[in-house]
Amino acid sequence: MNKIVVNNANLRKLMEGNKRYMASHLIHPDQSSERRFELKHGQHPFAIILGCSDSRVPPEVIFDQGLGDLYVVRVVGNVLDQMIVASIEYAVLHLDVRLIMVMGHSQCGAVQATCNHNQLEGHLPSLTFALNAALNKAKDLPGDLTENVILANVGLVSEELKQTGAHFPEMMKKGELVIVPAYYHIDTGKVELLT
Ligand SMILES: [Zn+2]
């Protein structure tokens, strides 16, 4: 993973922003009216973040980025479905974004709810369905079940994206696309890259 960090300028830019955030040395880049004006002709974000809808994990804040920098897809439990894959494919294939980060986080309430086997209301059983593979992978592991499911889900979602995104396998083979699993620690603000 260190090799990717060293060689990937976009990932380095993300992680440097996260370091500033952790140290409370935010520079709030690209948030001026000039930047807004500059973007009226189009967007060229340098990274895609697939993250959870949790109010404590807003990518622009935790990576200290601004307008037009990040293409963000947020959904409870950072799971995948067809529209989410389509959203990511749009950014890769039409906006030429070459880095995808799949970011889970500590204390994910959505995963917790699924692990507790609560009778879930409304459309929430579809979340359980989306997390089922991670739940199966993690259920016999030692340690905290919720944390294990969060980690398993990030890995499985990254793998699924690698395999199912249109043109993603060949792009990755040619080094034109990088998909990075990551885990955000709510208490410290650190984004940890997972291998
Ligand atoms: Zn969450």
Predicted features and spans:
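Divalent-metal-activated hydrolytic enzyme cores
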Residues: 1-44, 67-68, 77-95, 109-195
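Short glycine-rich or small-residue beta-strand-to-loop segments that form or flank ligand, phosphate
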Residues: 48, 71-74
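Acidic/His- and Gly-rich active-site-bordering loop/insert found
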Residues: 59
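Short helix-loop-beta junction
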Residues: 64-72
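Short acidic/polar active-site loop segments enriched in Thr and Asp
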Residues: 98
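Conserved functional hotspot residues or short segments at active or partner-binding sites
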Residues: 102
